[in-house]
Amino acid sequence: MTDTSVLDQWKASFFVEDFLEKKTITRMVTQINCEFEEVVPSSNPDSQIEVEEVSLYTHMDYNEVFTPVSCLEKCSALQNQNQDLFIDDKGILFVSSRKHLPTLPTLLSRLKLFLVKDPLLDFKGQIFTEANFSRECFSLQETLEAFVKEDFCMDKVNFCQEKLEDTICLNEPSSFLIEYEFLIPPSLKPEIDIPSLSELKELLNPVPEIINYVDEKEKLFERDLTNKHGIEDIGDIKFSSTEILTIQSQSEPEECSKPGELEMPLTPLFLTCQHSSVNSLRTELQTFPLSPVCKINLLTAEESANEYYMMWQLERCRSPLNPFLLTVPRIQEPHSQYSVTDLKKIFSVKEESLVINLEKAEWWKQAGLNLKMMETLEHLNTYLCHDNLSSNDTKIEIFLPTKVLQLESCLEHKSHSSPIALIDEKSTNAHLSLPQKSPSLAKEVPDLCFSDDYFSDKGAAKEEKPKNDQEPVNRIIQKKENNDHFELDCTGPSIKSPSSSIIKKASFEHGKKQENDLDLLSDFIMLRNKYKTCTSKTEVTNSDEKHDKEACSLTLQEESPIVHINKTLEEINQERGTDSVIEIQASDSQCQAFCLLEAAASPILKNLVSLCTLPTANWKFATVIFDQTRFLLKEQEKVVSDAVRQGTIDEREMTFKHAALLHLLVTIRDVLLTCSLDTALGYLSKAKDIYNSILGPYLGDIWRQLEIVQFIRGKKPETNYKIQELQCQILSWMQSQQQIKVLIIIRMDSDGEKHFLIKILNKIEGLTLTVLHSNERKDFLESEGVLRGTSSCVVVHNQYIGADFPWSNFSFVVEYNYVEDSCWTKHCKELNIPYMAFKVILPDTVLERSTLLDRFGGFLLEIQIPYVFFASEGLLNTPDILQLLESNYNISLVERGCSESLKLFGSSECYVVVTIDEHTAIILQDLEELNYEKASDNIIMRLMALSLQYRYCWIILYTKETLNSEYLLTEKTLHHLALIYAALVSFGLNSEELDVKLIIAPGVEATALIIRQIADHSLMTSKRDPHEWLDKSWLKVSPSEEEMYLLDFPCINPLVAQLMLNKGPSLHWILLATLCQLQELLPEVPEKVLKHFCSITSLFKIGSSSITKSPQISSPQENRNQISTLSSQSSASDLDSVIQEHNEYYQYLGLGETVQEDKTTILNDNSSIMELKEISSFLPPVTSYNQTSYWKDSSCKSNIGQNTPFLINIESRRPAYNSFLNHSDSESDVFSLGLTQMNCETIKSPTDTQKRVSVVPRFINSQKRRTHEAKGFINKDVSDPIFSLEGTQSPLHWNFKKNIWEQENHPFNLQYGAQQTACNKLYSQKGNLFTDQQKCLSDESEGLTCESSKDETFWRELPSVPSLDLFRASDSNANQKEFNSLYFYQRAGKSLGQKRHHESSFNSGDKESLTGFMCSQLPQFKKRRLAYEKVPGRVDGQTRLRFF
């Protein structure tokens, strides 16, 4: 038999659905009070039939009168939620049917008894002790079921473990009401023993409603991220002891004899250690031991008594308890503890400027609350929560157990001098601290922390003057940053009150008097409010090496007590000697690199927050530490690995990638500030190679950005403050001591910085330097090797120091690359060796500003990059843009004239061509030019000319107004813009040769900015090394003669010309080089540019004498007696065919000045050697319509195009030799579709011109299908026109003896078959090539016809065809319409280099079309008969014309 109560048994089987009044009444015999009586049982079919055993504890009957008492009348909010728990009024038959209702013994007979074990026994069956009470702490990772199943026994009885909202005042009894109604019997006469409250609590087992608790807390947590709610009055903040106990561990020890006391905590409480369904919060768990002698009192005695009494009163609402409870008189006990608010009132302590904002999210901070950990005053230790993942970097106070007498002696020696600020804990990001020159450290950066070893000797004397003597606490609280969003944190005063003696660790005795406790608390409060007298901004820390190991294991950083009170800075320097950490300001390159890293990390942090990574909510790149990101990475790695096993990888992999990127960036940041930019770049380069498959592109962009910063640093050398400080320190040591031996420990792997350090140290007079390296076979240095040297300074790498290193032989140790928690700091202190470290910090300007990369350029516009660009002479007309580029963006411009091809399309004064790199150009076009006629045509033609030199072209249309924010777009301007856009659309759809983009800028300032952005974009997207791209030290401002020769090529821009001369051995070698050689020498130059260049150079024979001269061309000698006409070897065409046949090389020779009336052209037989410079222009100069020399022939006059944009200026004495280059790479002509109507001299009618338009794609497509079989180098595709140049055949010369054309051996000789005859016979000059030879045409050749010219075609000169390999049979795809667009002209007396062609016979079906091929105006030659021969080496029987 167990001692239990009726109430306990009734509660165990009392359910709503088993109400007895719902059952019908029948008679049955039951035993009640040892007597058999007939009882009316329930007729409910669900009821039990068998007679149950009557309780052995029932000795008397009860008269039951049920009166419904509703608790919901006072809590209307619970009515709607509990409608299902109500009993229908029809079923309540208390009065009318009470005679028929079963008695209490009948009800008790239904009960089943269960044995309950002793509540004072633990799970091992042993009685709880006080020691077990104080060390009970449960993990957050335990599930709710574990807490329910575990039998936790507490001395203090928790009757109300239901969740209490912070907003509900504890004075409201309704918050403690249960949610369903009780049937309260008015007269119960118990005659049994009253069970204890512990037993009642154990049997009732009230469980808090965890589900609602979690939901509300999650909502509260979400709201807390944006706008945290405040409360009405801080003085009304009260916490239930049961709530606090439930939050932390669900079973904290309390003595039953004393009421539960609540006090406003002075130390953090772990609100994160709550039962939440959020999985990520489980990582916040930390277990802390509780003091065995301390008692958690969170309220004053008075408040605790009130709450205790109120809970008893509320429990009386539970009707079954009323008869069993005795009246407990309220006893006024003396107060043993006071809240902070009461103590402030008692001691009249007021905080200055403590203005409490009800809407502020940091109300708990200003109230002195810090809800991180629950401890009492006697044992106040604050730690970083979330398993070392807290981003909190505020100054945290460490209060250790101290004896009363010691504290009183400390208080007697209060300092009255200007004290020194003390920091007690290492900062989580000490390397990001601000310099000492900050005017108000506590005001500007309240979260600044330094390490224990930190000591500042710079600027101490300057900052001894008090500034801002009294700094309000709320200012510091408002500016506090980087608190974890799920931690309620409190920032203490920025400057702690000092003490003159070291507070040693001790433990409090349990039996302390009440007065001593009160005095201790008052003294502590006074200490906390001494910040008002502290004025110095110099911060000094000192670490206590004898710290508590147990506490150190639970914290991220070492903790040190408060030290050094009433001593000046000089005295501290003398006592500490050189045992300090000197802060060094970061260099410009380090600041720039940090800004780039921060700009790259900002979007990553945002993405992590959006991916619900809770620890990163308040992280900032400047404050997050290595251990935090490493833990996050390991956590995400485990999540991903678990997801892989389950086969569900959604966004977890993306979260893992972001965590890895953030960790890498933080690591690079630490390496950057610890060592140097070079070391950080080396680490980043290795990481980029290792993680190339996952993070390669992203890390590649960051690597390029840091490479650019490194280049800027090389161009603008900066001061190394760290080496300067080291040099000054060594000189001061040498002056103070006669013999010193300094050990310098380095961590950097960069050889450049190491060599620079050694170079500076070697310059110090009287200092002998030794650099120690480890043996290849051994990892560490031997002690003998270190002692063998006699130098006064030893430099050794960190990793080479072993266990037997002779530390005692050194009088001073310098850690050149300081890191947090350095092992050498503690080691030197243990050995009592003077120690100094150099720590790099960032200025406040870098930490405060937010840096974002330019979206277009991909770089920071604040960082000036030393660009060097080429610009045309039109830039002189825009001095505003020139000044902005040079002053605001550090862009230097070198002037070069426009190419001859550009000068054909309007004056160069209204536009500027800026060469960004070998691929990119910018055209600065004034919008005013678009008001003129033919403006769009000129712009498009300029693009056509630039397409030979560049692959990307940006057109910036700007207005010259400086502050113009609007566009002055007239009707003509809009019309031309529409035409330009239409042409650009065709470019973008049909061309891979030129990518054109058009931008309209509102003014010169926006124009200069766009140029900088385009330059950044080109630099970031280039595949070249940033150093190579930016280095333009080899450029020459003044153009050389060789450069001018190269600029005559229409495909060479000024940058490529100087690049060729800089890399090439000589100009002669460049002109003779093949395409493969040029591509190997100039990989950065576009391939099409080199192809065009080789296509031109392969046409000429360049002798050895032309090294310093322009290349010369050997042309055939002409004999007027034998030759009256000589056709051009280069098969030139008019400009219309040039534009359409953009992929072929044509040379347009100047026309004769006059045309004979008899329709014969008198040719000049004078031949001369042409210079390359004379044939540079691929298009003739622009002339007006009235400057054209009209042909006297009526057929010519009628066919001259009237709508052509430009005409040819015919000169007699100085012909213009214009060359157009091969455009072999383009799959479709960029300019052909929109520019076919532009021709120099239109011979055909407009209908024929339309026909030529349709021919263009066929010409382009046919070129793709043509290939060459060559032993030598192939530098050009086969073209469609009959007389276009094919291959790179060497020039031919005239043999007077044999009266034939002969080919000379040349390096560019190209053979089209297995064998070729060394001498290619040509037609005799006396013979007529195409008259009356129709019978000789072969049926194999087809597609090569010339239109019969009755009255329309005008042939001024006969195009002779030497080495007439017209087409192979497979290549004869041209038709007669295609040849209608080809016209051939010859410069009298001169011809260009010849190229070999395939020989093919004409189709007999095209006989008639050849009759008009000979111009009737030419002298008739002697007719010769055509003969055929087989091509040597051909197996397919291919034939060719045989020449006599």
Curated annotation (Swiss-Prot):
Record GO cellular component, one term: condensed nuclear chromosome
Broad class of where this protein is predominantly found: nucleus
InterPro entries the record matches: SHOC1
Record flagged with keyword Phosphoprotein: no
Keywords: Chromosome, Disease variant, DNA-binding, Hydrolase, Meiosis
Membrane spanning residue stretches: none
A single GO BP: reciprocal meiotic recombination
Pfam families noted in UniProt: DUF5587
EC number(s) given by UniProt: 3.6.-.-
Location of the protein in the cell: Chromosome
Effect of R1425H: In SPGF75; uncertain significance
Domain of life of the source: Eukaryota
GO function terms (MF aspect): ATP hydrolysis activity; single-stranded DNA binding
Leading EC class: hydrolase
Start-end of Low complexity biased regions: 1106-1117
UniProt key word Lipid biosynthesis: no
Location of the region described as Disordered in the Swiss-Prot/TrEMBL record: 1106-1129
Function (record text): ATPase required during meiosis for the formation of crossover recombination intermediates. Binds DNA: preferentially binds to single-stranded DNA and DNA branched structures. Does not show nuclease activity in vitro, but shows ATPase activity, which is stimulated by the presence of single-stranded DNA. Plays a key role in homologous recombination and crossing-over in meiotic prophase I in male and female germ cells. Required for proper synaptonemal complex assembly and homologous chromosome pairing. Requiref for recruitment TEX11 and MSH4 to recombination intermediates.
Membership in a protein family: Belongs to the XPF family. Highly divergent.
Disease listed for this protein: Spermatogenic failure 75: An autosomal recessive disorder characterized by male infertility due to non-obstructive azoospermia resulting from maturation arrest at the spermatocyte stage.
Complex formation: Interacts with TEX11. Interacts with SPO16.
Protein name: Protein shortage in chiasmata 1 ortholog
